[in-house]
Amino acid sequence: MENTENSVDAKSFKNAETKILHGSKSMDSGMSFDNSYKMDYPEMGLCIIINNKNFHKSTGMAPRSGTDVDAANLRETFTNLKYEVRNKNDLTCEEILELMNSVSKEDHSKRSSFVCVLLSHGDEGIIFGTNGPVDLRKVTGFFRGDYCRSLTGKPKLFIIQACRGTELDCGIETDSGIEDDMACQKIPVEADFLYAYSTAPGYYSWRNSKDGSWFIQSLCAMLKLYAHKLEFMHILTRVNRKVATEFESFSLDSAFHGKKQIPCIVSMLTKELYLYH
C-alpha cells in the first residue's frame, strides 16, 4: 500500500489535519412475518450522500481532502445496487436538516429501503455542517416510524464517516409476504434503523488524502464483493475486519503514526437485510 498521509474527521484537528499522513403519504410498510425485509418493491430506494469537504473559516476546520474519492466510490457502489443516488456537497447545518426533512416527506411507498451517507467532521453524537455542529438525532429523527410513515417497517441505513472523539487506537499484537395482516401492528418508532459508524465511540476516524477514508473504501469493496451473496450485517462484519487488519496510519507526526481503527455497527433492524431479491 502506498504511504500517503491520513487525516482524521474530528471537529477541531485544525493544524494536524494537514500534517498527518497526509413524512410522507400513507404507510405502505415492509412488515411481514418473514425473517427478512421485503426488498422486491418497484424501487430499491433513495441513497442520499452528504459530502462536506470545505468548512466556513469561523469553524477553524480544515478541508477534508480525499472525501470526493469516497463520494464517487459510494455513488458507483449504490448505483450498481439499483439505488437512486443523490449527491449533495458542502451543506450547512440548516441545509442538512432541510434536506432530511424534505426527503422524509417524500412518498417512499414504492421503495424497499432508505440509505443516507454522511461524510464530514464529527464528534460523539454530532456531525458537522459547513458552518458548525448538528445533533445526529435531529438528522435521523425525520425518518422515525411516527414521522416518515411510508418507511415504517422498512430498513433505514445511516452510514457515518466522521470522528467520534479524539482518542487514538494504538492497536495490540495478536497470535492469533403477509403484509396486510401486519399493517396495524405497533412497532417502536426507533425500530428498523441501522447506524454504521466509521469508528468506535470516542475515537478518531482516519481518511487518506489519495484513496479516501479507510471505512468507506472497505465498505464499498465489501458491498461490491458480497452485496448479492450475504446478509448486510455479515457484510459489515467483513468491513470491520478489513479496516481493523489492513489499515494503519502513516504520519509524519509520531503521535499519530501507526494507529488503528475499528468501525462500529449499531443495529435496531428487526429482520435480516439482503440488498437483493
UniProtKB/Swiss-Prot annotation:
Keywords assigned: Acetylation, Apoptosis, Cytoplasm, Hydrolase, Phosphoprotein, Protease, S-nitrosylation, Thiol protease, Ubl conjugation, Zymogen
Active-site residues annotated for this sequence: H121, C163
SUPFAM superfamilies according to UniProt: Caspase-like
TM helices/strands, residue ranges: none
One of the record's GO molecular function terms: cysteine-type endopeptidase activity
Highest taxon listed in the record's lineage: Eukaryota
InterPro entries linked to this entry: Caspase-like_dom_sf (IPR029030), Caspase_cys_AS (IPR033139), Caspase_his_AS (IPR016129), Pept_C14 (IPR002398), Pept_C14_caspase (IPR011600), Pept_C14_p10 (IPR002138), Pept_C14_p20 (IPR001309), Pept_C14A (IPR015917)
Primary location recorded for the protein, binned into one broad class: cytoplasm
EC number from the UniProt entry: 3.4.22.56
UniProt GO BP: apoptotic process; erythrocyte differentiation; execution phase of apoptosis; intrinsic apoptotic signaling pathway in response to osmotic stress; keratinocyte differentiation; neuron differentiation; positive regulation of amyloid-beta formation; positive regulation of apoptotic process
Cleaved propeptide residues: 1-9, 10-28
Catalytic activity: Strict requirement for an Asp residue at positions P1 and P4. It has a preferred cleavage sequence of Asp-Xaa-Xaa-Asp-|- with a hydrophobic amino-acid residue at P2 and a hydrophilic amino-acid residue at P3, although Val or Ala are also accepted at this position
N-acetylmethionine sites (modified residues): M1
Signal sequence, renumbered to the chain: none
Modification N6-acetyllysine occurs at: K11
Record comment: activity regulation: Inhibited by BIRC6; following inhibition of BIRC6-caspase binding by DIABLO/SMAC, BIRC6 is subjected to caspase cleavage, leading to an increase in active caspases.
PTM-bearing positions, type S-nitrosocysteine: C163
Maturation and modification: Cleavage by granzyme B, caspase-6, caspase-8 and caspase-10 generates the two active subunits. Additional processing of the propeptides is likely due to the autocatalytic activity of the activated protease. Active heterodimers between the small subunit of caspase-7 protease and the large subunit of caspase-3 also occur and vice versa. S-nitrosylated on its catalytic site cysteine in unstimulated cell lines and denitrosylated upon activation of the Fas apoptotic pathway, associated with an increase in intracellular caspase activity. Fas therefore activates caspase-3 not only by inducing the cleavage of the caspase zymogen to its active subunits, but also by stimulating the denitrosylation of its active site thiol.
The protein's assembly and partners: Heterotetramer that consists of two anti-parallel arranged heterodimers, each one formed by a 17 kDa (p17) and a 12 kDa (p12) subunit. Interacts with BIRC6/bruce.
Name of the protein: Caspase-3
Gene that this polypeptide is encoded by: CASP3
